[in-house]
């Protein structure tokens, strides 16, 4: 399997995941954990990490998806290895990951007292997933880390973008809907990146209110 085939397989795996999606809530713990794994995995694919490493990550996620489908008594779909016709979406995924990298870099510079202050301030938004650093090099640490909480909306925006991209994969000849879903996916990725930057500014000015005049 090469990088292009791996990306095709990624979307097919996400299609399997989506088949369970409409049965449950996004707030279900395992659901969020899988979205986080998919975020991690696609970032690694775009960076073209070592292919053997990527296949190992792929197999772990595929097993999780299989177990997840069994948990909700959903049969796997018989999907062929279909790819998107073009790659306009990649630029906007890269913007999303760049925003996430800034977010993680910002959080890493905070001490424990500052983290707690932000946690209290953002208590209604702090039910997301956790990230370790801008490289995301270790899936095990990526899953276990509980320092960097991604806002719930960012998970939702990523997931909604993937739903539209998966529709394009399953309906490659429907040109009218293809472009419409591509535009929606891009808009969700832009919204997700904006949400991350907005949180950075919110937390920064909470911790350093004297600098708030910089916003004007």
Q: Predicted segments — roles?
A:
Residues 1-168:
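N-terminal pre-first-transmembrane soluble regions of secretory-pathway and organelle membrane proteins
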Residues 40, 163, 167-170, 187, ...:
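Extended, non-membrane alpha-helical segments enriched in charged/polar residues
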Residues 54-58, 77, 204, 208-216:
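Polybasic, proline/glycine-rich intrinsically disordered low-complexity segments
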Residues 66-83, 177-191, 195:
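Charged, amphipathic alpha-helical scaffolding segments
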Residues 88, 190, 215-216:
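Membrane-proximal, non-transmembrane alpha-helical segments
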Residues 104-107, 111, 169, 193-208:
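Long, hydrophobic, amphipathic alpha-helical segments used as structural scaffolds
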Residues 158, 165, 182, 189, ...:
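Inward-facing hydrophobic residues that define packing positions of alpha-helical scaffold repeats
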Residues 166-180:
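Short, charged/polar, low-complexity loop and linker segments
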């Amino acid at each position: 399997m090469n990088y292009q085939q791996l990306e095709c397989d990624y979307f097919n795996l996400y299609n399997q995941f989506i088949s369970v999606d409409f049965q449950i809530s996004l707030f279900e713990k395992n659901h969020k954990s899988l979205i986080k794994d998919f975020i991690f995995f696609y970032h690694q694919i775009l960076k073209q990490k070592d292919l053997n490493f990527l296949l190992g990550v792929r197999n772990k996620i595929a097993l999780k998806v299989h177990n997840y489908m069994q948990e909700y008594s959903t049969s796997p779909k018989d999907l062929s290895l279909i790819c998107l016709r073009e790659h306009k979406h990649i630029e906007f995924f890269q913007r999303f990951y760049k925003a996430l990298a800034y977010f993680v870099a910002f959080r890493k510079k905070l001490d424990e007292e500052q983290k707690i202050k932000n946690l209290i301030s953002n208590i209604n938004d702090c039910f997301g997933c956790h990230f370790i650093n801008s490289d995301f090099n270790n899936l095990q640490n990526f899953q276990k880390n509980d320092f960097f909480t991604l806002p719930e909306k960012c998970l939702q925006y990523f997931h909604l973008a993937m739903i539209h991209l998966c529709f394009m994969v399953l309906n490659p000849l429907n040109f009218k809907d293809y472009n419409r879903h591509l535009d929606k996916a891009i808009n969700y990725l832009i919204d997700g990146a904006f949400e991350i930057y907005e949180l950075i500014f919110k937390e920064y000015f909470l911790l350093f209110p004297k600098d708030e005049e910089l916003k004007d």
